[in-house]
Amino acid sequence: KHGLISMKDNADINHLENERKRIASLDSETNNIHRILEDITELLDAIKSLGTPQFTRQARMAFMAKSFCSSLVEAGWFTNDEIEEFMKSINTVSSKFDYDFHKFSLGLMSRNEFNKIYGHLRSGTYDIRTDSYNQMVFRPVTEKNKNYKDKNVSKGLDENRLKEALTSIGFDIHPKEFNNFLVSAIEGREFLKFEFIIIERR
């Protein structure tokens, strides 16, 4: 069910981006201040219906997923290291950013290529007064011996132990399905945040 919800939320975000492009195109053809204000109001309404609820929902799902992981550690089913390795195996926007930043640092990706994907982001903050990456002047240095790899599909937590843990609290769900929820919830929140910020910045 969460997968279907995520698909619907992603579709809504894509619809919102199309609405933004349509409104921006109309505004580029007029100097009428009243028309522009009407279009701004229309875009804000679209964000309220096609963006904010979707991002909020995905953020809550990710919070639940991380809380479940913390509970699995507290109950002794998994160690902190195992959960940390599981988190690292998830192919999020953040992990892709680290990989591409490393490529940029080694000269394997141009500044224009990097900015095209990540230029709208701000370094570790929501503060709108902070410059985004495409406004910053920097020459990154990275650890050349650090091993960065493209990630494959996450294998998830050990299903046998996870099944015992779920059974112990009366959760009637297959461990594979639960693993899929954990991964998709964490990936989905980051993806939607990334796409939502692109729309806001444009």
Regions found by a protein language model. Give the residues of each.
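Contiguous hydrophobic, helix-prone segments at protein termini
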Residues: K1-R202
